[in-house]
Swiss-Prot record:
Cellular compartment(s): Cell inner membrane
Domain ABC transporter span(s) in chain numbering: 15-252, 263-508
Originating organism: Burkholderia ambifaria (strain ATCC BAA-244 / DSM 16087 / CCUG 44356 / LMG 19182 / AMMD)
Known EC number: 7.5.2.11, 7.5.2.7
Amino-acid positions noted as binding ATP in the UniProt annotation, renumbered to this chain: G47, E48, N49, G50, A51, G52, K53, S54
A Pfam family assignment: ABC_tran
The protein's enzyme class: translocase
PANTHER family: CARBOHYDRATE TRANSPORT ATP-BINDING PROTEIN MG119-RELATED, D-ALLOSE IMPORT ATP-BINDING PROTEIN ALSA-RELATED
Protein family per UniProt: Belongs to the ABC transporter superfamily. Carbohydrate importer 2 (CUT2) (TC 3.A.1.2) family.
PROSITE patterns assigned to the protein according to its UniProt record, in alphabetical order: ABC_TRANSPORTER_1, ABC_TRANSPORTER_2, MGLA, RBSA
InterPro entries according to UniProt: AAA+_ATPase (IPR003593), ABC_carbohydrate_import_ATPase (IPR050107), ABC_transporter-like_ATP-bd (IPR003439), ABC_transporter-like_CS (IPR017871), P-loop_NTPase (IPR027417)
Topological category with respect to the lipid bilayer: Peripheral membrane protein
Protein name: Putative ribose/galactose/methyl galactoside import ATP-binding protein 3
GO molecular function: ABC-type D-ribose transporter activity; ATP binding; ATP hydrolysis activity
Length: 513
């Protein structure tokens, strides 16, 4: 596939990266990569997690320094040694984790460290500070009071403040990393409107996202990376999503919805009755069988995560009974749950489930250290390493070695490490809370296959997901919640997105099947 459909007619690049390489200890993160951006365009950057997208953009933003290659702006070679150099060139980046101070006003956040001063240069000129912020908002056609404390804003409004901060440096290049991850549909529409305003002013936007439908709406071109290498640049119009996915993963993905096995005769592994906690969980009951994937669907705040955390002993309950393999058990702490063979993979794996500063080996062994202790005193380091390597092979975890820090792995591989941890604990009941959040399409496919394989081995799985196609693809049965209650149950063969949404927005229980 050609890098550009018609290079001769293409306008001059605002910024151009060629032959860029970057190496970290044990990892070639980038190898001979290229990318260009034109004024007034939205250029999507896509690839599986670990493909090198963020590394390439961090080099452009001055966070990392390249080992080789060239960066040109307006046709002139430039060196970007640090973020200040990038800002001086008019390059801004909006990180997925926003970098704002809640106790300061909007205007103070925008101009922090660069506040206009009064006559004697001692005191901040608050009037000018607020006027300058208002001028940027006028350019964005955004109605936002510069005096408002950032901590009082929604995530969407805070993101607009980050964009305004970047524009305050007269940014001509704006890098957006997964900007809609925490936004609802109305907020996404507002963000796209702002992007349209920026394009009209000639700002070039690099847009990193896994959401194909969004890119269809706003991207002009898309560059695909794979394994730290450049694959292709194609126009978004006229390029199918299947073609882009194939470029991203280097293979065709199995995206067909499969017919789930009949597990209705299997033994019941987990039974929950009358589970309640305030208004968050209200008289919830369900059964889960061996070899079954039970999908939990519902809108944000429906109570799905709360149920999982309650069963796992992470949160107290007011009432309810839990039976494991037919026996009533008492679960007051996660240790109690694990002792009964229940594992929980949190939706926030980086804070709950993964020690990102530790290596792969120690993360896998973290919850099972006792089995590696010899004579009550010494860790059997060799057995721990061999066990970790066995799970790395079994789950196809992509890592140079088990000594690699977990923070350097992609989201999909981090998720596999957490799964390995619970498999090592011999958990046969597993709660997966948003198991594919923040990972790319290729890694999602691998997680799906892994869940299917675990179910085929007899593991009993609850999968909580906000992505309806994912729930429909993976579940053998689907439980729907609304406002803390189970409002319905659907067999996989009868389930549709429409039926799920009907149940997710009603307050009374029913069964559609």
């Amino acid at each position: 596939m050609q890098p550009d459909p018609n290079p001769a007619a293409a306008p001059a690049a605002l910024i151009e990266l060629t032959g860029v390489s970057k190496r970290f200890p044990g990892v070639q993160a980038l190898d001979d990569c290229r990318f260009d951006l034109r004024a007034g365009e939205v250029h999507a950057l896509m690839g599986e997690n670990g493909a090198g997208k963020s590394t390439l953009m961090k080099i452009l933003a001055g966070v990392y320094q390249k080992d080789g290659g060239e960066i040109r702006m307006d046709g002139r070679a430039v060196e970007i040694d640090d973020p200040r150099a990038a800002q001086a060139l008019g390059i801004g980046i909006i990180h997925q984790e926003l970098n704002l101070m809640n106790h300061l006003s909007v205007a103070q956040n925008i101009f922090i460290g660069r506040e206009p001063r009064g006559r004697f240069g001692v005191f901040v000129d608050e009037d000018k500070l607020n006027r300058d912020a208002a001028a940027i908002f006028a350019r964005m056609r955004l109605d936002l009071d510069p005096r408002t404390l950032v901590g009082r804003l929604t995530v969407a409004k805070q993101q607009m403040v980050e964009i305004a901060k970047a524009l305050s440096f007269d940014s001509r290049v704006l890098i957006m990393d997964e900007p809609t991850a925490a936004l609802n549909n109305a907020e996404i529409a507002e963000l796209f409107r702002i992007i349209g305003e920026l394009r009209a002013h000639g700002v070039g936007i690099v847009y990193i996202s896994h959401k194909m439908d969004e890119l269809r709406q706003i991207a002009d071109r898309v560059t695909v990376m794979r394994d730290g290498k450049y694959v292709a640049t194609v126009p978004m119009a006229g390029t199918s999503m299947d073609a882009i996915i194939a470029m991203m993963v280097g293979r065709q993905l199995d995206t067909e919805f499969r017919t789930p096995p009949d597990t209705s005769a299997n033994d019941v592994a987990l039974e929950v009755r009358g589970l309640s906690r305030g208004r968050a969980i209200r008289d919830v009951g369900f059964t889960l069988r061996r070899g079954e994937i039970l999908g939990f669907a519902g809108l944000m705040g429906a109570g799905r995560t709360e149920v999982a955390r309650a069963v796992f002993g992470a949160d107290p309950v007011d009432a309810g009974e839990i039976r494991v393999h037919g026996k009533t058990v008492t679960i007051r702490t996660p240790a109690d749950a694990v002792a009964h063979g229940i594992g929980y993979l949190s939706e926030d794996r980086k804070h709950f489930g993964l020690a990102v500063g530790m290596d792969v080996q120690n993360n896998i062994a973290l919850s099972s250290m006792r089995r590696f202790v010899r004579r009550g005193l010494f860790l059997d380091a060799r057995q721990m390493r061999d066990t970790a390597q066995s799970y790395v092979r079994q789950l196809a975890i992509r890592t140079p070695s088990v000594a690699q820090p977990a923070r350097l792995l992609s989201g999909g591989n981090q998720q596999k490490i957490v799964i390995a941890k619970w498999l090592l604990r011999d958990c046969d009941i597993l709660f997966f809370d948003e198991p594919t959040r923040g990972i790319d399409v290729g890694a999602k496919s691998e997680i799906y296959k892994l869940l299917d394989a675990l179910a085929a081995e007899g593991k009993a799985i609850v999968m909580i997901s906000s992505e309806l196609p994912e729930v429909l693809r993976m579940s053998h049965r689907i439980l729907v919640m609304c406002e803390g209650r189970v409002t319905g149950e659907l067999r996989a063969a009868d389930a549709t997105q429409e039926k799920i949404m009907q149940l997710a927005t009603q307050r009374e229980s029913t069964v559609l099947s």
